[in-house]
């Protein structure tokens, strides 16, 4: 990490620290330590077998939560460098932001949220925080990973007021309408850039959306035209890849340019000063509108495609059946979770299911409900 960060960037010296004090790391920054702890966590390894849109076994080349997190980190670090923000913090947040995601993407989250309605609901950002604060079991002195406040702040993108009240200092911004650090704001938008554009790539690869359909979307059509001008003979996968590449570059450049303008105008003098201001990291109005158009397109043509809806229906069924069985008879849980259920109730069932990979959830369903196992 550069030592000459501007005063509004988070650094080791202005960090609010860890919940449990530790001696400073040797040869690396506090946020490099956070990043390394995330990478070595069990939950991070599981992301390889948790999906974005397509169930893990549907195809080997589709993105998983792991590849998505790596892509978010790459985009975030590049923009952070141009904005003179703390790259290691952006990277740590980016790598950790999906640790609490359920199997089967958003379908799994929706199903688990429905199951948990009577018990406080389920939200993957809060679950990601729970993973790094409580569920990881690696260190002798504490549960979780004992990450810095600023990394945890970035993981927690949103929270209801009732949930925020239980989070102490971390939940204050949701109670008082404050912002997060610039690094947290950036990681959130790097996630958006990666998510939308890579779903375009996977959607075309799967055959569920076509290039012709995408040409109706302004941002895609413009970059497609530019690619064809530069490479008249390009076609197929390379054409789509170059188009998506151009879109990502445009979004990153726009985000950098607009954010610099906002930061220079606001002139914050510390991370805490940033937190008292409106959000400073953001797109131009034009790009924001084009992003929204792309989101609407993906929702209508990819996420609501009948084949994806069939996969989502299966995911709902698996999650709901597993939850109902464990809630009706906690003795069906593995012994480790049975002991915890006595003290923490249905949250432990949510922890168990949310920690499953796609493959493990399918296997557990078969073990529970198949008359004859494969």
Curated annotation (Swiss-Prot):
Keywords: Hydrolase. The lineage of its organism: Bacteria, Pseudomonadati, Pseudomonadota, Betaproteobacteria, Nitrosomonadales. The keyword Hydrolase applies. This is Deoxyguanosinetriphosphate triphosphohydrolase-like protein. NCBIfam families: dGTP_triPase, PRK01286.1-1. Residues 65-196 form the HD domain. InterPro entries: dGTPase (IPR006261), dGTPase-like (IPR050135), dNTPase_2 (IPR023023), HD/PDEase_dom (IPR003607), HD_domain (IPR006674), PHydrolase_assoc_dom (IPR026875). The keyword Hydrolase applies. One of its GO terms (molecular function) is dGTPase activity. One of its GO terms (biological process) is dGTP catabolic process. Residues 1-28 are annotated as: Disordered. It holds the Pfam family HD_assoc. CDD domains: HDc (cd00077). Belongs to the dGTPase family. Type 2 subfamily.
